[in-house]
């Protein structure tokens, strides 16, 4: 059984007991979350496609931790002007364990 769910504008293919990294959420580590924007649900040869979402479907998960992604270097330079600047950026993510997919 798997589902395609939309979380914060991004789509994820999830199954039970799967860890996913979503854009940072406001929930604390250890709290439970539920997602109801299910776009597609597959269950034992039966596929339900939402219009735009599958009615009555829900995914339950648990927030494991908040992490930061790899560092990205932003470097700007203008030739012959002596202008250069260097910045770093690390995107915040939330690690979520998918516990259950409900119809």
UniProtKB/Swiss-Prot annotation:
PROSITE patterns, A to Z: RIBOSOMAL_L21 (PS01169)
Complex and partners: Part of the 50S ribosomal subunit. Contacts protein L20.
InterPro entries, alphabetized: bL21-like, bL21-like_sf, Ribosomal_bL21, Ribosomal_bL21_CS
Task of the protein: This protein binds to 23S rRNA in the presence of protein L20.
Family under the similarity heading: Belongs to the bacterial ribosomal protein bL21 family.
GO molecular function, one term: rRNA binding
GO cellular component: cytoplasm; ribonucleoprotein complex; ribosome
Pfam families per record: Ribosomal_L21p (PF00829)
Protein name as annotated: Large ribosomal subunit protein bL21
Gene from which this protein is expressed: rplU
GO BP terms in the entry: translation
Native source organism of the sequence: Amoebophilus asiaticus (strain 5a2)
SUPFAM superfamilies associated with the record: L21p-like
């Amino acid at each position: 059984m798997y589902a395609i769910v939309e979380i914060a504008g991004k789509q994820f293919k999830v199954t039970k007991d799967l860890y996913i990294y979503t854009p940072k959420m406001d929930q604390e580590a250890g709290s439970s979350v539920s997602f109801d924007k299910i776009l597609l649900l597959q269950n034992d040869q039966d596929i339900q496609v939402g219009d735009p979402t599958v009615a009555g479907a829900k995914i339950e998960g648990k927030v494991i931790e908040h992490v930061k992604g790899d560092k990205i270097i932003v470097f700007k330079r203008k030739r012959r002007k002596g202008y250069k600047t260097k910045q770093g950026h690390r995107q915040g993510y939330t690690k979520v364990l998918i516990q259950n997919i409900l119809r």
